[in-house]
Amino acid sequence: MDKSMIKKRGRPPITKDYPNPLQSPMAHSSMQVQKQGPHSFAKPLMKVGQSSPSPNKRRLSIDHHHNLAATTRKGRYRGVLLSTPTKKSSTNGSTPISTPSSNDSYNNTVFSETRKTFLQSSPPIMTSSPAFQKKNDYMFPSQEQFKLSLTITESGKAVIAGSLPFSPSSKSSHLMNNNNKKIMQNEKIHKGSKKNAPKFEKRRILSLLKQMKNEKYCDTDTLPEAPPAKPSRSDIIDTELPTIIETSASPIGSARNNNILLSQPPQSPPSSAQLKPPSTPKSSLQFRMGFTPNVALNSVSLSDTISKSTNAVGASNNNNQNGNSISNIADANTLLTLTNSPGVFLSPRNKMLPKSTTASNEQQQEFVFKFSSGDPLLLTDDADGNWPEMLFNVSNTPRRQKCFNTPPSWINFGSPGLFSPPRSSNVMVNGTTVATASDSGNVHRQLQAQLEAQVQVQSQSNSPTQRQQQQRQFQIPPPHINMNSSPPQINIASPPHQSMSRVSSIYFNKEKTTTGVANMLGNTKSENLQPPANLFTAAHGPSTPRNQEFQLPTLIECTPLIQQTMNGSLGTKYIPGTSISNSATPNLHGFPVGTGKAPSSFDDSLKQNPYSNKQDDARTALKRLIDDQ
């Protein structure tokens, strides 16, 4: 089959049987299109440019002055009047005209070079109105006016043709400055124009033009098409305008300034921000955004963020914990207030209130709601978030194995499997020794060891007098029970198969923890260190287990400020007359020595003397702990 007969899909046979491909019909048509392409595409552009009339048409309208209808018909289109005039129009404007009211003077005025810029600001149809033709005697009285592009209106005001539209503000200033002088000169010019005296009129107009040029009022003149006002009306306006401006400008301005000065204090951002309620009270987004709820603090979650100055105070208190523990204990309430409830420190209704323990405890109650949001990133505020130190404490803390099988509740945030590691995890003590925690009875020993290590750390770094003050601070709780200890009666199961030497070793190792844990224990009140809820049997009171401290993840437990916050924020007045030291202090008195007291003996001691000899119990436990070591 011939290759010339084979057709390719989608392409016509351009080189069909032609020896020269350029002779094919399609090649010929394509060459023609290429040749005609630039011209054909340039024609629409030329047509767009030729939409305005050509100079020949303008010459016809200027030369043949008798054809007024044609100029009127074409004058309706703005393009005719906006086009650039030719030189012939200016020469025709200088030719002598018999009468000023003739059609020649009218056409000469409309199509002169100086009138072109004036007509740009108004529709051309206005020039052909009968009212405009009736006023030709007044507006164009002589040839020299057209030559100088100056017209005089019926009110006797001199107007330069080709100026910008006349604004009221410029009119008022113009009338205020040259009121009497211009009226006198305009009346003389108007009388001279009626007498048809070109030479005298020329001198007057030249002098007036020079005066107006010096005063720079060329751009603020009225238009000829504007309806002329009567002289009496203009005089009234001239006399009223200065009084209006003088009497109203300064008092209004001063009154506005006074209003602004008086209205600035209530409109200041701090006052408006203080009265603004939280946009989303119980959502987890506002914890990150830093909204401060100032209303309904008892029902909404505590979502305030601490300012930079608050952070500096908290950091300085943390740094001073190693050197001086008395100042830390004295500032415990301040740290609690700054850490968990900055609304007490920052809100407007609490700025004047003293930072008392009762106010801090009331604010600490709302801190529980913050942990029920379910977002682990929202457990701590970004303001107190010293994240490298927190992560270091998480990785080096010896308390990571604490995870109790308590039923989930609204406060049980750290339920098993959520944040806590497995139970059989190894706990690094001092970075060298490893102590494997078992589930059978080790929980209560670890709690006791933490409390004793706390007391021992405080006692070893201070004098006996300071020790007494610290123990008073630790042992005197507020008259309400903590949420962690829901029942008043505590029955502790006896720990099986564990020797006293192992218990004492746990006590000793618990004391040698990292600096962050030591600081945390130094700031932690002993009222919050108790056995978990699954070791309790409640006789009355709330049945929901509330050991929030050890159910929380290790990020909260190992940060000093957050630990201080959690120890104070979970206190709720459920059962008056009971305290946490009822369960913790007698345990220190009897359990480490191995007296073998039954749980009922502890209950009896709690019932008989709940608040007596708290300092003696702490001292006795401390001495026995040191003797065992």
From Swiss-Prot:
One GO biological process term: regulation of transcription by RNA polymerase II
A GO CC term assigned to this protein in UniProt: cytoplasm
Keyword flag Cell cycle: yes
Transmembrane segments: none
Residues with Phosphoserine modification: S268
Biased composition (Polar residues): 21-37, 245-260
Compositionally biased intervals (Basic and acidic residues): 614-629
Basic residues compositional bias, start-end: 1-11
Ranges where the record places region Disordered: 1-60, 83-106, 217-286, 455-485, 586-629
Purpose: Activator of G1-specific transcription factors, MBF and SBF. Promotes both the timing of G1-specific gene transcription and cell cycle initiation. Associates with SBF- and MBF-regulated target promoters and this binding is maximal during the G1 phase, prior to maximum budding. Affects cell cycle initiation by advancing the timing of transcription of G1-specific genes. Overexpression advances the timing of SBF-dependent transcription and budding. Depletion delays both indicators of cell cycle initiation.
UniProt subunit comment: Interacts with transcription complexes SCB-binding factor (SBF) and MCB-binding factor (MBF) at their target promoters. Interacts with MBP1 and SWI6.
Descriptive protein name: G1-specific transcription factors activator MSA1
